[in-house]
């Protein structure tokens, strides 16, 4: 259950994020997306009651194990692709795909959670839809940093970041210095470890393309990646 204080929501101008999170979980009924069971409020608090995920979040497993095998990463990524496909079909960009926002159920399947930064009401065919600068620095796509405006393609870039972190234990381009990190994201080619299979390297290169129009998923969404 997530408990939100109304004074903090209003004081920090977070109303739209709380509403978006409730809306996204309410409209989606996908097996790989955390569902909202109940939503209610008292005088000073909002309550979002979500399904229980006993497996914890993916970041805890990465911290404990450093990285995952390609087979294990493939399983997680496959389920996440299906979840993103469902969101996109409902006109929603996730925009905050990272290990912290992926939880595991009782048998180890993935579920996406934390939709406060999602963008609703996406019109198919529009080139540039959202312009918000949002998300954790290491998980920003080039078009978000440059504030070009972004569409659903941003989620496929973040899928590449997530896959890279699963396989290597750290996001691509990472640096503790924000300015260097942004420069790396915008200018540097992704460094692919030799121990990765050719298929994994190819997928990472195509997902992490800096030009969203040339990125894998640009034409046919999830169908291009499956």
Predicted regions and their residues:
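Conserved N-lobe beta3->alphaC-helix segment of eukaryotic protein kinase catalytic domains
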Residues: 3-28
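A short, aromatic-enriched beta-strand patch in the conserved N-lobe beta-sheet
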Residues: 38-39
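Conserved short submotifs of the Hanks-type protein kinase catalytic core
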Residues: 44-57, 61
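Activation segment signature within eukaryotic-like protein kinase domains
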Residues: 76-77
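Conserved end of the kinase activation segment
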Residues: 143-153
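Structural helix C-cap motif within protein kinase domains
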Residues: 168-171
């Amino acid at each position: 259950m997530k408990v939100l204080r109304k004074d903090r929501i209003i004081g920090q101008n977070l109303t739209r994020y709380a509403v978006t999170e409730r809306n996204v979980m309410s409209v989606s009924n996908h097996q790989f997306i955390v569902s909202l069971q109940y939503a209610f409020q008292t005088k000073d608090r909002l309550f979002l009651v979500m399904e229980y995920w006993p497996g914890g979040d993916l970041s805890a497993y990465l911290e404990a194990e450093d990285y995952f095998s390609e087979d294990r990463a493939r399983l997680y990524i496959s389920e996440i692709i299906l979840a993103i496909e469902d969101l996109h079909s409902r006109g929603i960009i996730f925009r905050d795909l990272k290990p912290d926002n992926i939880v595991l159920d009782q048998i180890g399947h993935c579920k996406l959670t934390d939709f406060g930064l999602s963008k609703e009401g996406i019109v198919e065919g529009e080139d540039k839809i959202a312009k918000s600068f949002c998300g954790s620095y290491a998980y920003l796509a080039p078009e978000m940093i440059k504030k070009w405006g972004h569409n659903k393609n941003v989620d496929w870039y973040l899928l590449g970041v997530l896959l890279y972190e699963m396989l290597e234990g750290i996001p691509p381009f990472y640096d503790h210095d924000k300015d260097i990190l942004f420069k790396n994201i915008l200018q540097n080619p992704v460094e692919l470890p030799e121990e990765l299979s050719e298929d994994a390297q190819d997928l990472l290169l195509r997902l992490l393309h800096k030009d969203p129009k040339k990125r894998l998923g640009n034409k046919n969404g999830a169908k291009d990646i499956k």
